[in-house]
């Protein structure tokens, strides 16, 4: 589209991102038909994990990208412009513990510190600093819900859309930290050199 390359997130935001690109006039049929192919040069699309989108956009491998606000908040060092809140894919960043007695609160009372497992160490650290609580952050990559069930941590900070996975693992939300939605981001150089094309995209998205 007007010579622009888009970084497209696979996963939870994938389907709605493709629908949005369809509305912009891009042909996403090949993307929808190929689960394993990642680069679609004719359409100007490259697909990847949401957490990689800011990296590719910052490096100029893509002019524009779509990713969650959670990714941007966890990686503030990425030099990208956040252009638009796209409004879809809402998820809550939450502080959760095992149902029943709040083990995290008990640990704070007894020890002055609680252990919190998360994939989002920066977001978690900033939150507990902001709320005046001592937390030892344990970074994990996989199923965060396991941590309080196995004794690795008293609590977790994680992203949830429906809360189903938390409930199925006997966890309850104690606090909501933030709500994250999909955002449109741009490479700073492309934002200058391809301003007309990018402004057109932003204008059309704002117009719905």
Per-range role (PLM):
Residues 1-208:
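Domain-level signature for soluble enzymes in the chorismate/prephenate branch of the shikimate pathway
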């Amino acid at each position: 589209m007007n010579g622009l390359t888009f970084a497209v997130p696979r996963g939870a935001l994938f389907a709605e991102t493709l629908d949005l690109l369809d509305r912009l006039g891009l042909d996403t049929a090949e993307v929808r038909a190929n689960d394993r192919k990642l680069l679609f040069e004719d359409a100007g699309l490259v697909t990847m994990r949401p957490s990689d989108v800011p990296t590719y956009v910052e490096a100029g491998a893509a002019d524009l990208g779509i990713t969650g606000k959670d990714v941007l908040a966890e990686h503030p060092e990425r030099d990208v412009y956040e252009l638009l809140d796209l409004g879809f894919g809402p998820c809550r960043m939450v502080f959760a513990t095992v149902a029943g007695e709040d083990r995290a609160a008990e640990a704070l009372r007894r020890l002055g510190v609680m252990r919190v497992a998360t994939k989002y160490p920066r977001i978690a650290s900033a939150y507990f600093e902001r709320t005046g609580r001592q937390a030892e952050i344990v970074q994990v990559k996989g199923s965060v819900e396991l941590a309080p069930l196995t004794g690795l941590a008293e609590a977790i900070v994680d992203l949830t859309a429906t809360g189903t996975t938390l409930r199925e693992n006997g966890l309850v939300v104690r606090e909501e930290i933030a709500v994250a939605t999909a955002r449109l981001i741009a490479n700073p150089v492309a934002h200058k050199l391809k301003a007309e094309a990018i402004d057109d995209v932003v204008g059309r998205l704002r117009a719905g």
